[in-house]
Amino acid sequence: NSQSVSSEHFYLSDDELPRYFSAGKKHRMEAFYRKMRQRFAILMDSDGQPEGGQWNFDANNRNKLKASDLPSVPQPLVFSNDVSAILERLKRHNIKTMGQAHSSLLWPVNRQQAKELLDYFCRYCLPLFGTFQDAMTGRLKQRGNNRQWSLYHSRLSFALNSKIISPQLVVDTVLAHYRAQQGQLLCAEPRIDIAQV
């Protein structure tokens, strides 16, 4: 049995969702995304229109990584969190798991690490996140470089899903960084990241 409950972690409460997703109709995330931007005044101008004059820049995020782009791909910020005690506890209690676990976890495990990763994303990855959002490459591995495996992605989903940080914090931080760097970032970059959140 499962039960749905509301959480302050989300922008909408559980009982508000039916207003945005009527039963029996087809829905597009783009339409929902626009409604959320309007409701919460995210990247909207004073006339209620999207900043920059358009809702999305999806056509701009389908670029392929060329060999000349690879040297500028940032090395991901990773952590070295010792989880050996947790692994031992799982083993001691015969808890079955999927996959293979290592004694060092590279994901953030507390708010400080999650905020550090968010700040790192804004500083090093956000400027080209939109440009290469959908890009994939095996070239880095072919060159013996596994350090840049995450390309320009934030890798914040673990911190968000485990509620270490909130979507509100991510959106506010990305917007603050965008406003501070306005002349240097394409208008597309924060929109694309915010849509992902």
Please state what every model-predicted region is:
Residues 116-197:
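Gly/Thr-rich phosphate-binding loop signature of adenosyl cofactor/nucleotide-binding cores
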Residues 1-107:
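Beta-rich, aromatic/charged-enriched effector core domains that present basic-aromatic interfaces
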Residues 113:
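Conserved functional hotspot residues or short segments at active or partner-binding sites
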